A protein has these predicted regions:
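Caspase-like cysteine protease fold
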Residues: 142-192
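Extended, regular secondary-structure scaffolds
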Residues: 9-11, 21-22
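Short Asp/Glu-rich motifs
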Residues: 54, 129, 158
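Catalytic-core segments of thiol-dependent peptidases
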Residues: 16-102
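Structural alpha-beta junctions
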Residues: 5-10, 30-46, 110-118
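Short, small-residue-biased leader/transition segments that mark boundaries at the very start
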Residues: 1-3
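C-terminal soluble interaction/assembly domains
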Residues: 80-153
Length: 192
């Protein structure tokens, strides 16, 4: 298979727009277009609120969204887990203000629920200086490591932005055939 999806993750993708700002929504629309080209089963939510708790969200391996201060919706349901290798980010000014309390912010909540990689902000960087999700995904698909992709997605280096995950992680480095041979090893709740 020649598609980048054949070189990486196995699961569903979710993009949650906020109808809040043309710039941020534009990044997420571009992210959704990239995911579509990759061939993922994709759900795009264009409602102003974040995903509803009743939204279908199973085997999530890619999640890009914004804009609420703390994790909510399906991410708080008992038993919710990201699929192995998941890359997840939620744009918010203080998404990584604390990593010790998953109920406060997004970064800690995403990691606590199994995300392998995320980026966030410890303090207000303003939208233009946060990680651009479309650039992050584009770099990862190209084969960049997580740290390279996070660097490319950040318009200016700042103490406000952080990366959580193995800096050498390359989510699109494992072939689809290899993933499918290991599929039976996944717990039923994570098997796509």
């Amino acid at each position: 298979c020649a598609l980048p999806i054949c070189q990486g993750l196995l699961g569903r993708a979710y993009v949650d727009l906020a109808q809040r700002d043309r710039t941020g929504d534009g990044w997420l629309e571009d992210t959704a277009r990239q995911i579509e080209v990759l061939g993922f089963d994709l759900m795009v939510d264009r409602e102003p609120a974040t995903l509803r708790p009743t939204a279908r969200i199973d085997a999530p391996v890619l999640y890009f969204g914004w804009y609420s201060g703390a994790a909510d919706g399906p991410f708080l349901l008992p038993g919710f887990r990201f699929a192995p290798g998941a890359v997840a980010l939620h744009i918010h000014s203080f998404s990584a203000a604390t990593l010790r309390a998953p109920a406060e912010g997004w970064a800690a909540a995403l990691v606590a629920r199994g995300a392998t990689a995320t980026v966030g902000n410890v303090y207000e960087p303003y939208l233009q200086f946060t990680h651009h999700p479309n650039l992050l995904l584009r770099a990862l698909v190209r084969g960049a490591t997580l740290v390279e992709a996070a660097y490319e997605a950040l318009p200016a280096l700042s103490w406000q932005a952080i990366l959580l995950g193995d800096p050498l992680y390359r989510p699109f480095a494992v072939s689809l055939d290899e993933q499918l041979t290991r599929r039976d090893e996944l717990p039923p709740t994570l098997a796509p």
